[in-house]
Amino acid sequence: MSNANNSAMNHITLPPISSFDNLIKAAERQYNGEASSASTHPTLPNMNISNGSGSAGASSSMLSYQLLPHSNDVSRSNSSSSFLPSVQQPTEGSASASETSSSASPSRSISPILKVAGPSSVGGAGVSTPHSTKINKPRKKKQCPICRNFYANLTTHKATHLTPEDRPHKCPICHRGFARNNDLLRHKKRHWKDEILSQSGVLSNHNDGKGGSVSPNDDDTHEKMTPMNSVTDYAQLKSLHQIKGTFKCPFNSTLIQLDMDMYPYKLKPLNFETSNCHQTGVFSRCDTFKNHLKALHFEYPPGTKKKDRNVVPGRCKHCGLKFENVDVWLNEHVGKQCGYKYH
């Protein structure tokens, strides 16, 4: 019995160490995905054992066969998790590997397709985002049925197509109609322009008379031109001062005098100097009113350019107080500490 065992042990031979090295290297290549043809061949390459014994070759082939399923599972899992770009551009080796993996596990082959198809359907060309819709949204303008032009305020524009008698804003003096309130204000200022200038001329002649004497003719003329003389003049004066949305210059001598004539209780000495800065002293726009004050009623240093007016110091022309800049003077001084307050 012992002789039989000894003879069996004499017939069993192990493969050389170099063959195990080749086996380990082949398994590493299979695990790293470097051997693309490993899934198509049942045995690993270069596994011939050079000792000439059949048992050693059989044992080495069995070892390689035992390692192959594990390496195939690893490569299959790697391909399903990290080879998503290969779905768009497959190679020959990857195509064969994907076919084998799809036949082995259908769920693994479907899940990468679903992952790729999801983002493409969301970010497709047919889907529009709210941001792009907001950018491409046109401005809301309505077309005029008469002139076929587009306007933001179509109701106001339609009034321009009406006759002057049918327009909504009418002048109380000549009964002419206007489409906008600002147009009516400018029209009223034209009615007052000649009358105010004539009043100023008569008053200046009255004050500058030679020898301090006034002729009866001049006195009669002055009485005729007094704003409070007739009901018509008073109505015109009242309509000019009571127009809503207007801006009145607090330093205009003509406008201040007209306001005092309308409201006698306000007749008192002023603590500032007035000036004949404007024909009427009434403005329909706030920006025009502020530009008028900055240009004519604030004194800048000599040689100051127009672009530097907001940053240089100066003083009020009517009371002499100094300020850091014209904006501080306009916001804190005009109409509060200096200037006439209208009714």
From Swiss-Prot:
CC terms in the record's Gene Ontology section: nucleus
Stored InterPro entries: Transcr_Reg_ZincFinger, Znf_C2H2_sf, Znf_C2H2_type
Entry keyword Metal-binding: yes
Residues with PTM Phosphoserine: S71, S111
Gene3D superfamilies listed in its UniProt record: Classic Zinc Finger
Superkingdom of origin: Eukaryota
Extent of Polar residues compositional bias: 33-45
Main subcellular localisation: nucleus
Residue ranges with Low complexity bias: 46-56, 71-86, 94-120
Region named Disordered: 31-56, 71-140, 198-222
Cellular location(s): Nucleus
Keywords recorded for this protein, A-Z: Metal-binding, Nucleus, Phosphoprotein, Zinc, Zinc-finger
A Gene Ontology molecular function term of the record: zinc ion binding
Zinc fingers classed as C2H2-type: ranges: 169-191
Record field: transmembrane: none
Keyword Zinc-finger: yes
Miscellaneous remark of the record: Present with 1240 molecules/cell in log phase SD medium.
Cited PANTHER family: FI01119P, ZINC FINGER PROTEIN
Listed name of the protein: Zinc finger protein STP3
Organism of provenance: Saccharomyces cerevisiae (strain ATCC 204508 / S288c) (Baker's yeast)
